[in-house]
Each structure stands twice: as C-alpha cells, then as structure tokens.
C-alpha cells in the first residue's frame, strides 16, 4: 500500500484529499504547516502533495530543504498560477505542479504515474565495479566492502551519472 503525505493549510482540502485517496487504498499522512512536513517525512512517504501557501516555511522552502533527504516525488498542489511560481517549484525540486481548483481524478492519475515511475526505478539493478564496490540503483545506495552508504538524492544522482558514463 503506497503512502501519501498531503500538506495543505486548508483543512477542507486535507479532509477531501485524505478521504479520496484512502478510498482508493492509499495510506495517508497529513501536515497543516511547513513545520509539520519536517516531522512527517520521517515516516518516509512514497509521494508528497505539497501546497505552497502554508504557515511557517512555505512549500517552496520546504521542498528545497527536504529534497536532499527524500527521493520520493513531490507534487505541488497550489492556487499560484504564475509561471514564475511554477519555475520556482520545479527549481526547488518539485516533480509536478497542479493548480487549484483541480480534478481529484486527474490528480490521482498524476500520483499513479509518478509512483509507477518510482517503482520502475526501484527495480533497477546492482552493478559490481570491483570486489569491494557495488552500486545499487534500486536502493540508491553504495556498498563499499561491508559498509552500505546512503547518499542524499543529488549526490547519488551524480554517482549514478558518473558510473553509467565511465
């Protein structure tokens, strides 16, 4: 069962999305402020729906700060329609941008598409570079001897890019 962290300061939207996605078999976590997001990501959601306009740190700042911690997809779900806001969202590490009002069915299709891509990425392979060095693309980790090294997303992406173009 996939889990979704829904982050929005509007209780009506939190309640509606929670009910909608629960009825479709998702496990739901919620956050009503930027600060609550930092507490909830420890539960390792499979995907995050993130509003921009929230009390405390806004969604852009939250995304920027958690992007090196989590590798799951982040979909901005916001009333901001300006192109600059969309660009800032993607630059902060967002994977998608949905403008309110939105269709729950379309949002579910986007969530499913992102989770499908994540699932394909997780089924990647391990590559042994020597007796002591193994890169596991599905777990996003490196094993050096008996030590397993978990890297932040950007650092692993750099290692993966370099290893695939050696």
Regions from the language model: what does each represent?
Residues 14, 50, 55, 82, ...:
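The feature encodes the CheY-like receiver
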Residues 32-33, 58-61:
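Acidic catalytic/metal-coordinating carboxylates
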Residues 7-8, 31, 48, 98:
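Conserved sequence signature across two-component system core domains
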Residues 41, 49, 60-63, 67:
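Hydrophobic alpha-helical motif in two-component signaling modules
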Residues 9, 64, 68-129:
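Basic, amphipathic DNA-recognition helix from helix-turn-helix-like DNA-binding domains
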Residues 2-3, 113-166:
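Short, Lys/Arg-enriched segments at the junction into DNA-binding effector domains
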Residues 15-23:
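Charged docking surfaces used in two-component/phosphorelay signaling
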Residues 30-47:
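Acidic, metal-coordinating helix/loop segments flanking the phosphotransfer/catalytic sites
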């Amino acid at each position: 069962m996939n889990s979704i962290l829904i982050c929005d300061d509007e209780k009506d939207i939190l309640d509606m999305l929670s009910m909608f996605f629960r009825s479709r078999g998702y496990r739901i976590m919620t956050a009503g402020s930027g600060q609550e997001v930092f507490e909830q990501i420890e539960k390792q959601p499979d995907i995050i729906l993130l509003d921009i306009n929230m009390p405390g740190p806004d969604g852009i700042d939250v995304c920027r700060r958690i992007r090196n911690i989590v590798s799951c997809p982040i979909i901005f779900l916001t009333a901001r329609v300006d192109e600059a806001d969309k660009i800032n969202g993607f630059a902060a590490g967002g994977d998608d941008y949905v403008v309110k009002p939105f269709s729950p069915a379309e949002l579910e299709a986007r969530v499913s598409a992102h989770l499908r891509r994540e699932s394909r990425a997780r089924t990647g392979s391990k590559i042994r570079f020597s007796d002591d060095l193994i890169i596991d693309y599905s777990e996003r980790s490196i094993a050096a001897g008996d030590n397993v090294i978990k890297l932040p997303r950007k650092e692993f992406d750099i290692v993966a890019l370099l290893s695939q173009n050696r």
